[in-house]
A protein has these predicted regions:
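N-terminal catalytic cores of secreted or lumenal carbohydrate-active enzymes
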Residues: 156-180
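Secreted/periplasmic carbohydrate-active enzymes, especially glycoside hydrolases
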Residues: 1-155, 159, 170-171
Length: 180
């Protein structure tokens, strides 16, 4: 697994920062120290080649609704300056293998090497115009789960809020992005 995030220095001078991440479950800790020039943004990358703790043996896999639990990991990032926490960010994510083929002129989707029969609905401009936020996404995506759906087609990529994707991850709903 690899992880990347942007660190922005809003100060007028170069600043030494420590970026630390903790992934649970597993209590996987990784950190890197770097200098960030004044008024710049630096991308910090953590790669399993240099941070072997990012190789998760026997991970709890994320599954679409109807195929298993949508297991999620949580990563807490801390950016520290002079030994004090300057900024934090929490991120949830699932670990899965996605593949597809078009054998026999039919599109097949596989999650974790298992064929998935896609059942879902379209979200488009009308849902975007409803201006869902926060808990509203959770409720609407949960209803898709309860209808035994496992995919939402995000027509024209019109829904872009983090809360939408977080709810989909939580309930095992795959997102099919359709643009133009």
């Amino acid at each position: 697994m690899s992880v990347a995030l942007d660190v922005k220095n809003n100060s007028v001078e170069k600043t030494k920062v420590l970026v630390r991440g903790t992934i649970t479950p597993g209590n996987i800790v990784f950190q890197k120290e770097l200098d960030v020039n004044a008024h710049t943004t630096e991308q910090v990358k953590f790669d399993k080649r240099y941070f072997p703790q990012l190789c998760i043996d026997q991970p709890r896999l994320w599954w679409p609704n109807g195929y298993g639990d949508p297991n999620l990991y949580h990563c807490k990032f801390e950016v520290m300056v002079d030994g004090r926490v300057s900024e934090t960010k929490d991120v949830s994510f699932g670990i899965k293998k996605y593949s597809y083929d078009k054998e026999g002129n039919t599109f097949h989707i596989y999650i974790n090497d298992i064929p998935v029969f896609v059942k879902g609905a379209n979200w488009g401009m009308s849902e975007y115009m409803l201006r869902c936020r926060g808990a509203e996404y959770d409720t609407k995506v949960r209803l898709h789960k309860e209808m035994n759906f496992n995919m939402i087609r995000n027509w024209l990529g019109s829904v872009t809020d983090d809360e939408f994707y977080e709810a989909c991850d939580k309930y095992g709903i795959m997102v099919w992005m359709i643009f133009g």
